Amino acid sequence: MSAADEILDIVDENDEVIGQAPRGEVYARGMRHRAVFVLARDAEGRVFVHRRTATKLVFPALYDMFVGGVVATGESYDDAALREAEEELGVSGLPRPDPLFKFLYDDGAGRTWWSAVYQVRCPLPVNPQVEEVAWHGFLTEAELEQRLGTWEWVPDGLAAYERLRAGRAAQ
């Protein structure tokens, strides 16, 4: 089965399931669905940053400070976060990612999904999926901040990261 054929839950403004559809149709019709974002850090606290491959269905060739993806039909956010983190980082046996917050991403142009944000400590080395990741590295928070204005980032990941920073600043 191709990624476009994967069945996703369609959800309403309250994150309640109202139907299912293939991923390709979900994207083409701008149907609200669910996604997870996992901020992966190494033992030194550096953040895993990567550039998506040019073949990705959404936001190809852009940089991201999260690993993650869509939540499959019937899958919990927590299970999806662990599955996606292990798949994209190419590691197994990760601890269950810690949930941080959830928000509704909506770019106003037909891309909208409930987004659950997590964090996890990741042992090295990582072996990212070549189908998903064109480049990767671990950056300090300062290095990441320096690149926010110069690299082209996935807009949903950037929205999640801005909320994460705002939450830290409010503490």
Where in the sequence are the language-model features?
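Short, well-ordered strand-loop elements centered on a beta-strand within folded domains, enriched
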Residues: 17-20, 45-51, 125-129
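Short, structured loop/turn "capping" segments at alpha-beta junctions
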Residues: 91-98
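Basic/polar N-terminal segments that are highly enriched at the extreme N-terminus
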Residues: 1-4, 169-171
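Conserved Nudix-box catalytic region and its N-terminal flanking loop in Nudix hydrolases
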Residues: 25-36, 42-83, 87
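Short helix-to-loop capping/linker segments positioned immediately adjacent to catalytic or ligand/cofactor-binding
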Residues: 15, 92, 103-107
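Acidic, metal-coordinating catalytic segment for phosphate/diphosphate chemistry
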Residues: 2-37, 43
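Nudix hydrolase/Nudix homology domain
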Residues: 21-24, 61-63, 73, 99-171
